[in-house]
Amino acid sequence: MAINLQTLFKKKREGKKITMVSTYDYWSAKLCDEVGIDCILVGDSLGTVVKGEGDTLSVTLEEIIYHTKCVMRGVKNAFVIADMPFMSYQVSMEKAVENCGRVIKETKAKAVKLEGGEEIAELVYKLTRIGIPVVGHVGFTPQHINVFGKPKVVGKKKEEEEKLRRDFRALEEAGAFMIVLESVPTHLAKELWKGSNSIVIGIGAGKYVDGQVLVFHDIVGLFEDFKPKFVRRYLEGAKLVKEALKNFKIDVEGGNFPSEEESYG
């Protein structure tokens, strides 16, 4: 059965954990959907995971639209969220609404995700009022990498903690139905979650939230460039793929592929 906002809020009310995976193509989305993953995020993390960039800043609106369309073709039930890339919603309210609307119309995703807190609250309010569900994202926000300097835990210092509370409340009050907390101390994430009517999804925010999100390539061990502390690999996918490719190379070079059975008479 197709998952919608009501399904997700029902899980929150019943204390059932929500699963989310960031993925970018038809096949990985299809696999996620077939095993019952609740939400798929077409994240701007495709900048690092798919494009091989050092950060997410180069991802374009057209790339998000392209990859979200690919994902949607593989999905029957999962709730698909499209990430709005850097500078697609920061220039002006008018341009932001236009771009978010374009993503929803062209991809048929169910929601958009925006990074930031108080500074985007007015936009979140506007989008929700015109029928575009919004996922917020606070804590460590990759689009602010040039401000942070490097990935870091946000909320250890008193001023960071206070700002995070303000940003979280601003998003919730503006109407964000879901808020992602990234790289936030467990006790602070728990505090925000306990007082929230929004769905709270963690990534490096401990277990006291409504659900968890990880990147597909991290879960299956395909991405080897770096491994954040919060990542749990469930498969050493890169090793398995390399072994298969090596065996293909050996068989071709040794004249063992193709066989008679793999050839047309």
Swiss-Prot record:
Keywords per UniProt: Cytoplasm, Magnesium, Metal-binding, Pantothenate biosynthesis, Transferase
Record Gene3D superfamilies: Phosphoenolpyruvate-binding domains
This enzyme's EC code(s): 2.1.2.11
Entry's Gene Ontology molecular function annotations: 3-methyl-2-oxobutanoate hydroxymethyltransferase activity; magnesium ion binding
InterPro entries: Pantoate_hydroxy_MeTrfase, Pyrv/PenolPyrv_kinase-like_dom, Pyrv_kinase-like_dom_sf
A GO CC term assigned to this protein in UniProt: cytoplasm
Binding-site positions, Mg(2+): D44, D83, E115
Residues annotated as binding 3-methyl-2-oxobutanoate: D44, S45, D83, K113
Protein's pathway: Cofactor biosynthesis; (R)-pantothenate biosynthesis; (R)-pantoate from 3-methyl-2-oxobutanoate: step 1/2
Cofactor note (record): Binds 1 Mg(2+) ion per subunit.
Taxonomy, superkingdom: Bacteria
Active-site residues, Swiss-Prot/TrEMBL: E182 (proton acceptor)
Compartment annotation: Cytoplasm
First-listed, main subcellular location of the protein, grouped into a coarse class: cytoplasm
GO BP terms, alphabetized: pantothenate biosynthetic process
Enzyme type, top EC level: transferase
Pfam family, one: Pantoate_transf
Substrates-to-products reaction catalysed: 3-methyl-2-oxobutanoate + (6R)-5,10-methylene-5,6,7,8-tetrahydrofolate + H2O = 2-dehydropantoate + (6S)-5,6,7,8-tetrahydrofolate
Cofactor(s) of this protein: Mg(2+)
Function, in words: Catalyzes the reversible reaction in which hydroxymethyl group from 5,10-methylenetetrahydrofolate is transferred onto alpha-ketoisovalerate to form ketopantoate.
Subunit structure: Homodecamer; pentamer of dimers.
NCBIfam families attached to this UniProt entry: panB (TIGR00222), PRK00311.1 (NF001452)
Family indicated by similarity: Belongs to the PanB family.
Designated name of the protein: 3-methyl-2-oxobutanoate hydroxymethyltransferase
